[in-house]
Amino acid sequence: PAGAADALGELSDEGSPAYAAAARFTRANVAQKAGDTKRAVAMLGAIAGDSDVPQSYRDLATLRRTGIEFDTLKPDAIIARLKPLTDPASPWFASAAEMTAIAHLRKGERSEAGRIYADIAARDDTAPTLKQRSLQMAGMLGVDAVNDSSKEAAKSAEPTG
């Protein structure tokens, strides 16, 4: 393990931007697994703030950091931090939007949370488990998130007379 840590350190410092970022993520993961959450959060924050790192890695670092810190952050801080990732064009939209919806729930903003869950559920690229969870959450919050084609498919599957 000591040799691996040294190799990761070298990659972090001297590798191409993508390899260096991957090594830095691995080091943050190792810190988190070892129970050093503070160090993991700091490492992920450094990745997120490093303009030499490809944007997709920076966004992932923001998402991971927010996930680790989620229970200790104020809802408004979560919403602000994840705002760029909740753009529908973002590849991180569904994950960031789910955390944002939970933050709105923590603020007592049920209708906004329901709208966000409906947006997550409506996307074709949302993972099936997240889509199902979002449909359920939207429904519990009073938002009909079942799209018309899903309603028609369910209706046509009902037995007739």
Language-model regions: role of each:
Residues 19-24, 28-161:
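Soluble extracytoplasmic domains of inner/organellar membrane proteins
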